[in-house]
């Protein structure tokens, strides 16, 4: 009986999901010109009256129409975006979007593997292009993302994916671009007040650090030796030691960051990014000196300590920017898949607390592309991918972020989603908005 019930339930859910899926956009066949909009290039510059033309998925011109004559007849489609804002597609960093659909169902959680060391665990093939959450994220300007693993000590490898595709092969922008590791926390709970328990915590942290060092030493020796015996975990680490992969270390405390800097030097790791870094405001110059980039997690969060300034999380991006640290934003934490849509508003809060506006745009676009080494994205300049969107107002402000057009590699994206459809459905039912 139970088997029959579950079989019927799976069939019903499959049919329901089939009807609810959005069809990916077709490859660009017509040349398109966005005319008259205020263009945020993604490099800190703005063109108040711009023309952006793209063909075959590539930008062919990006100019100021006050100083350049544009032949609009060259284009198959001309879209007047006067009075609107044009941005490069925002990039969701350190995201688990597409790796989990229903939090209460363990079988849908594809972002975590069992065990401590899983560098060969790939998010690439687990990415679900049919997630019902993805369209809700796209409609706020998040068009591509770094899909990252969680759990263990070495969690696995992340990949960069498009948020409109038929399958993971179709979605991939850059496969297996980095390895994620969780640095141990030297954390003692407030209710632990005897020295024996404190020493136990410190001993556990030291043991984990030793495990990390041992694993990296074995991996480095494996790479140098070129063993005939294939070890998949060690093979996944190979590109890290030759500078082809980036190491993302998840950590928040000053002590952790200092330990990570020493670790970077010890193993001669060329590319390293700290994810989280809540206490980075204490040592921004040290981070910059060691050429470490940062993914700032959840600007909308409380400070770590009672004595901290209440708004220090909001100020952190500005502090890092002044120190010359390359940084970007993520929304790691509770309900992070659906919360990815709010990443632009984290940047907006940072602007209100001292970060220059165009630096905030860079932290959502070109900074991300630089860290991920996807040079085709993050800028609206000639030769780059036509991954961009048009907003009726400021895209970093909740009340004015209203996307009218979006393109991924020149393909015009469907911006509707199930939540918006339900909103309009019930507004219409109760006469809250006029019928269109």
Locations of regions flagged by a protein language model:
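Divalent metal-coordination and catalytic microenvironments
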Residues: 37, 52, 57, 83, ...
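Polyanionic/metal-chelating signatures
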Residues: 138-271
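His/Asp/Glu-enriched, well-ordered alpha-helical/loop segment
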Residues: 102-103, 108-120, 246, 288, ...
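Active-site core of metal-dependent hydrolases
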Residues: 49, 222-312, 370, 392, ...
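Acidic, glycine-enriched loop/beta-strand segments at the rims
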Residues: 22-26, 39-51, 64-68, 338, ...
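Bacterial Sec-dependent N-terminal signal peptides
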Residues: 1-25
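Extracellular/periplasmic ectodomains of large secreted or surface enzymes and adhesion receptors
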Residues: 29, 405-436
